[in-house]
Amino acid sequence: MGFCLFANVAIAARYLQKTHGVGHVAVVDFDVHHGNGTQAAFEDDPSVLFISMHQDPRTCYPGSGYDFEVGDGPGRGYTLNIPFPPGAGDEEYLAAMEQKVVPKLDHFKPEILLISAGFDAHGEDPLAQIELSEACFGEMTEQLVRVADRHCGGRVISALEGGYNLRALGRSVVRHLVGMGGN
């Protein structure tokens, strides 16, 4: 369906629900590509909030993740797609975090927060046309950790999803891990 044979974070979300009794799971995906597999897994499920920040689907594979895709049936309103035009950068992403992502998470009050941490939205990555810096990845991570501290006892799981410029990937992962630690 997408870049991955298995949607690792979607599998983890369902595992946490079925095996550990977690009720409400939030998934935030900031990979440059829309998380179509995760969205498909939960689009009719109100127990999982899925938020994807990605490049405009008219300009980037897989061609899904329009802002009008909000979930189906009982899951309507539990999918938030935030597509960005080519050339968008830190300012646009951080504004979306503050104005859309964090308020949606605060309203949902997850019991655990899962991050699909793709770093191919970095400005040096060759695969797409989003211009994020490693500092932006760190700030987004810190904001997500603060949400987890407020609502789920700091429970956050992050899974590496993508990044194709190894230098930019390395710097971004380091900044993300620092953000995960709250420093």
Outline where the language-model segments fall.
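Short active-site-adjacent structural elements
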Residues: H122-D125, N165-L169
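Flexible, low-complexity linker/loop segments at domain and module junctions
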Residues: Q143-D149
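A short helix->loop->beta-strand "cap" motif at the edges of active sites that frequently abuts
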Residues: R150-R155
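Conserved alpha-helical scaffold segments that buttress catalytic/binding sites
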Residues: M1-Q143, L177-V178
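Short, electropositive alpha-helical surface patch
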Residues: S133-E134, R167-N183
